[in-house]
Amino acid sequence: MSKASVMQRLRAAGLRPTVARIGVLQVLQSSAPDALSRDEIYRQLYLRGTPVSVGTVMQVVAQLSKLGVVHHNGRQGRGSGYLLQS
């Protein structure tokens, strides 16, 4: 997902495109079709050099989920996580 399309998706949801929001969406796009936990999203952002905290990732994922931009698959245990809503 290009940075421009990520920014469009965020603006369509009424959100300002921040480094954390853009990073979370790009990580979820690159992991598709696999779901990622919040910790896995944080690890991927850390490896990419994106300066965000675990708390920020948790807040961003919760906000994006509430607005329908990402979806929590609701499964328990392994395989539980967040997916980019198509």
What are these regions (language model features)?
Residues M58-A62:
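Short, hydrophobic-biased segments on the C-terminal half of alpha helices
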Residues E40-Y42, Y46:
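A short acidic, leucine-rich amphipathic alpha-helix
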Residues R75-S86:
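Short, cationic-aromatic polyanion-contact patches
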Residues S65-G74:
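A short, conserved structural fragment
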